[in-house]
Amino acid sequence: MKIALSCPASLPATQFGGIMFLCLDIAKESSKLGHDVTIFTTDLDFANNPKTFNKKLPRIEKIQNFLINRSHVWFSIQLFFVNPGMYFQMNKQNFDVIHTIGIRSFQSLVAAFIAKKKKIPLVISDQGGLTTHPDLTSSLTKK
């Protein structure tokens, strides 16, 4: 089965946390079962802050038995990273299923558009909570 995974960050941005680790775990385990897996993500490098993007990271990188396909972020609004190149990368390929992780992201929107356009099943996994994110103000929960 050819599987596309979509998430806002991947290696080397390990500080990004849960979404990235969940995506990597799914990629590792699925590829061990013989599936053809590609992670579509940004070029977030994280280098001590969540706004460091690195155009020098390989656009396509093979790690273990899966691929990481990165595209450059044009701009970001807090942790909402806009990388339109991901749409074109995903649109060029055909997948049996698309799995997006972290639904409050540009990458999930792209995955949903591609799935709808190409009539590919879409799996959505959320990770984290809207009111627990450290970058959001506490005014969301104040009464």
Predicted regions and their residues:
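N-terminal subdomain of nucleotide-sugar transferases
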Residues: M1-K55, Q64, I120
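Structural motif
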Residues: A4, V97-H99, S125
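Histidine-centered beta-alpha loop that forms part of the nucleotide-sugar donor binding/catalytic region
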Residues: P8, I101, D126-G129
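Generic structural signal for helix capping and beta-alpha/helix-loop junctions
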Residues: A13, A47-N49, Q78, Q107, ...
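Short amphipathic alpha-helical segments
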Residues: G18, K51, V110-F113, T137
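Generic beta-sheet signal
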Residues: F40-T42, S71, S125
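An amphipathic, basic-hydrophobic alpha-helix
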Residues: N54-K56, I60-T100, S105-F113, K117, ...
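Nucleotide-sugar donor phosphate/pyrophosphate-binding loop at the beta->alpha transition
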Residues: P121-V123, L130-K143
